Amino acid sequence: MFNLPYHCKALLTAKQERGLTFDDVAKAINKPEVWTTALFYGQASTDKSTAEAILKALGGEQFWTDYNDRLEAGQEKIDIRRVLNGLSGNGEENMGVKGMVTRGATFEVPPKDPVLYRLYEVLVVYGYSYKALIYEKFGDGIMSAIDFRTSLERKKDPKGDRVVITMDGKFLPYSDPSAWGTQ
Protein backbone atom coordinates (compact mmCIF):
# COMPACT_ATOMS: atom_id res chain seq x y z
CA MET A 1 0.00 0.00 0.00
CA PHE A 2 1.23 3.52 -0.69
CA ASN A 3 2.70 5.68 2.06
CA LEU A 4 -0.17 6.05 4.54
CA PRO A 5 0.19 7.22 8.14
CA TYR A 6 0.25 4.45 10.77
CA HIS A 7 -3.27 5.14 12.02
CA CYS A 8 -4.72 4.93 8.49
CA LYS A 9 -3.31 1.45 7.90
CA ALA A 10 -4.83 0.34 11.21
CA LEU A 11 -8.23 1.86 10.40
CA LEU A 12 -8.34 0.30 6.93
CA THR A 13 -7.33 -3.07 8.37
CA ALA A 14 -10.11 -2.90 10.98
CA LYS A 15 -12.69 -1.80 8.41
CA GLN A 16 -11.79 -4.70 6.14
CA GLU A 17 -11.61 -7.26 8.97
CA ARG A 18 -15.06 -6.22 10.19
CA GLY A 19 -16.55 -6.25 6.67
CA LEU A 20 -17.69 -2.63 6.92
CA THR A 21 -18.13 -0.05 4.19
CA PHE A 22 -17.18 3.61 4.53
CA ASP A 23 -20.92 4.32 4.50
CA ASP A 24 -21.40 1.99 7.50
CA VAL A 25 -18.75 3.87 9.47
CA ALA A 26 -20.05 7.30 8.37
CA LYS A 27 -23.57 6.43 9.51
CA ALA A 28 -22.27 5.09 12.83
CA ILE A 29 -20.50 8.39 13.58
CA ASN A 30 -23.14 10.61 11.90
CA LYS A 31 -20.68 12.25 9.47
CA PRO A 32 -20.55 12.56 5.65
CA GLU A 33 -19.30 9.48 3.81
CA VAL A 34 -16.63 11.23 1.69
CA TRP A 35 -15.26 13.12 4.73
CA THR A 36 -15.14 9.89 6.74
CA THR A 37 -13.27 8.20 3.90
CA ALA A 38 -10.80 11.11 3.81
CA LEU A 39 -10.05 10.45 7.50
CA PHE A 40 -9.19 6.84 6.71
CA TYR A 41 -6.68 8.00 4.07
CA GLY A 42 -5.05 10.67 6.27
CA GLN A 43 -6.52 13.65 4.42
CA ALA A 44 -8.41 15.04 7.45
CA SER A 45 -8.32 14.98 11.24
CA THR A 46 -11.13 15.12 13.75
CA ASP A 47 -11.94 15.80 17.39
CA LYS A 48 -11.30 13.20 20.08
CA SER A 49 -14.96 12.23 20.56
CA THR A 50 -15.41 11.49 16.84
CA ALA A 51 -12.13 9.54 16.83
CA GLU A 52 -13.41 7.47 19.76
CA ALA A 53 -16.73 6.91 17.95
CA ILE A 54 -14.83 5.62 14.91
CA LEU A 55 -12.87 3.16 17.04
CA LYS A 56 -16.13 2.00 18.62
CA ALA A 57 -17.75 1.58 15.17
CA LEU A 58 -14.79 -0.57 14.16
CA GLY A 59 -15.36 -2.95 17.07
CA GLY A 60 -14.02 -1.13 20.09
CA GLU A 61 -11.07 -2.17 22.21
CA GLN A 62 -12.04 -5.84 22.03
CA PHE A 63 -11.55 -5.86 18.26
CA TRP A 64 -8.04 -4.41 18.57
CA THR A 65 -7.12 -6.84 21.36
CA ASP A 66 -8.39 -9.83 19.35
CA TYR A 67 -6.64 -8.60 16.21
CA ASN A 68 -3.32 -8.19 18.01
CA ASP A 69 -3.68 -11.66 19.56
CA ARG A 70 -4.03 -13.22 16.08
CA LEU A 71 -0.84 -11.66 14.70
CA GLU A 72 2.08 -13.88 13.88
CA ALA A 73 5.57 -13.35 15.26
CA GLY A 74 7.21 -10.30 13.71
CA GLN A 75 3.97 -8.56 12.68
CA GLU A 76 3.46 -5.12 14.18
CA LYS A 77 0.69 -4.88 16.75
CA ILE A 78 -1.78 -2.04 16.48
CA ASP A 79 -1.48 0.51 19.28
CA ILE A 80 -4.96 1.93 19.81
CA ARG A 81 -3.53 5.10 21.42
CA ARG A 82 -1.50 5.84 18.27
CA VAL A 83 -4.62 5.33 16.14
CA LEU A 84 -6.68 7.64 18.36
CA ASN A 85 -3.91 10.25 18.38
CA GLY A 86 -3.50 10.08 14.60
CA LEU A 87 -7.23 10.54 14.01
CA SER A 88 -7.46 13.47 16.41
CA GLY A 89 -4.45 15.28 14.98
CA ASN A 90 -1.87 14.31 17.60
CA GLY A 91 0.04 11.63 15.70
CA GLU A 92 3.65 11.65 14.56
CA GLU A 93 2.50 12.50 11.02
CA ASN A 94 1.24 15.86 12.34
CA MET A 95 4.88 17.00 12.60
CA GLY A 96 4.48 18.62 16.01
CA VAL A 97 1.46 20.76 15.08
CA LYS A 98 -1.85 19.53 16.51
CA GLY A 99 -4.33 18.79 13.74
CA MET A 100 -1.95 19.54 10.87
CA VAL A 101 -2.62 17.24 7.94
CA THR A 102 -0.31 16.93 4.95
CA ARG A 103 -3.03 16.75 2.33
CA GLY A 104 -2.15 15.29 -1.03
CA ALA A 105 0.98 13.51 0.21
CA THR A 106 -0.40 10.17 -0.99
CA PHE A 107 -1.10 11.49 -4.49
CA GLU A 108 1.22 11.47 -7.49
CA VAL A 109 0.64 13.57 -10.63
CA PRO A 110 -0.42 12.28 -12.98
CA PRO A 111 -1.93 9.46 -10.95
CA LYS A 112 -1.36 5.89 -12.10
CA ASP A 113 -4.54 4.43 -10.59
CA PRO A 114 -7.25 4.33 -13.30
CA VAL A 115 -10.01 5.85 -11.13
CA LEU A 116 -7.78 8.66 -9.89
CA TYR A 117 -6.49 9.24 -13.42
CA ARG A 118 -10.07 9.65 -14.74
CA LEU A 119 -10.75 12.27 -12.07
CA TYR A 120 -7.48 14.02 -12.99
CA GLU A 121 -8.49 13.80 -16.66
CA VAL A 122 -11.82 15.49 -15.87
CA LEU A 123 -9.90 18.49 -14.53
CA VAL A 124 -7.46 18.46 -17.46
CA VAL A 125 -10.31 18.37 -20.01
CA TYR A 126 -12.95 20.47 -18.22
CA GLY A 127 -10.86 22.58 -15.83
CA TYR A 128 -10.82 25.70 -17.99
CA SER A 129 -14.53 25.26 -18.71
CA TYR A 130 -15.24 25.20 -14.97
CA LYS A 131 -12.97 28.23 -14.49
CA ALA A 132 -14.67 30.21 -17.29
CA LEU A 133 -18.16 29.36 -16.06
CA ILE A 134 -17.27 30.29 -12.47
CA TYR A 135 -15.99 33.63 -13.77
CA GLU A 136 -19.12 34.25 -15.87
CA LYS A 137 -21.55 33.30 -13.12
CA PHE A 138 -19.73 34.65 -10.04
CA GLY A 139 -16.96 36.99 -11.14
CA ASP A 140 -13.21 36.86 -10.60
CA GLY A 141 -12.51 34.35 -7.84
CA ILE A 142 -12.22 30.72 -6.89
CA MET A 143 -14.25 27.85 -5.48
CA SER A 144 -13.14 27.11 -1.95
CA ALA A 145 -11.85 23.65 -1.13
CA ILE A 146 -11.87 24.65 2.54
CA ASP A 147 -15.53 25.71 2.90
CA PHE A 148 -16.40 22.66 0.82
CA ARG A 149 -18.72 19.68 0.75
CA THR A 150 -18.63 16.74 -1.61
CA SER A 151 -20.62 13.58 -2.11
CA LEU A 152 -20.73 10.57 -4.38
CA GLU A 153 -23.88 8.77 -5.44
CA ARG A 154 -24.80 5.89 -7.71
CA LYS A 155 -27.43 6.74 -10.34
CA LYS A 156 -29.30 4.00 -12.20
CA ASP A 157 -29.21 4.34 -15.99
CA PRO A 158 -30.42 1.93 -18.68
CA LYS A 159 -27.05 2.24 -20.45
CA GLY A 160 -25.11 1.45 -17.27
CA ASP A 161 -25.04 2.91 -13.77
CA ARG A 162 -23.54 6.38 -13.47
CA VAL A 163 -21.21 7.89 -10.87
CA VAL A 164 -22.46 11.29 -9.67
CA ILE A 165 -19.86 13.37 -7.84
CA THR A 166 -21.03 16.68 -6.40
CA MET A 167 -18.55 19.42 -5.50
CA ASP A 168 -20.06 22.21 -3.40
CA GLY A 169 -17.57 24.95 -2.57
CA LYS A 170 -18.08 28.51 -1.40
CA PHE A 171 -17.21 31.18 -3.97
CA LEU A 172 -14.32 33.38 -2.83
CA PRO A 173 -13.82 36.57 -4.85
CA TYR A 174 -10.35 37.98 -5.36
CA SER A 175 -9.90 41.30 -3.60
CA ASP A 176 -10.23 44.47 -5.62
CA PRO A 177 -6.92 46.37 -5.94
CA SER A 178 -8.61 49.45 -4.44
CA ALA A 179 -8.84 47.51 -1.17
CA TRP A 180 -5.06 47.11 -1.08
CA GLY A 181 -4.36 50.69 -0.14
CA THR A 182 -1.21 52.50 -1.19
CA GLN A 183 2.35 51.66 -0.29
Curated annotation (Swiss-Prot):
It catalyses: cyanate + hydrogencarbonate + 3 H(+) = NH4(+) + 2 CO2. Pfam families: Cyanate_lyase (PF02560), CYNS_N (PF21291). The keyword Lyase applies. One of its GO terms (molecular function) is DNA binding. Its EC number is 4.2.1.104. It comes from the Eukaryota. It is an enzyme of class 4 (lyase). The keyword Lyase applies. The active site is at R118, E121, S144. GO terms for biological process: cyanate metabolic process. Keywords: Lyase. Coiled coil: none annotated. Signal peptide: none annotated. InterPro entries: Cyanase, Cyanate_lyase_C, Cyanate_lyase_C_sf, CYNS_N, Lambda_DNA-bd_dom_sf. Catalyzes the reaction of cyanate with bicarbonate to produce ammonia and carbon dioxide. Belongs to the cyanase family. This is Cyanate hydratase. It comes from Cryptococcus neoformans var. neoformans serotype D (strain JEC21 / ATCC MYA-565) (Filobasidiella neoformans). The gene is CYN1.
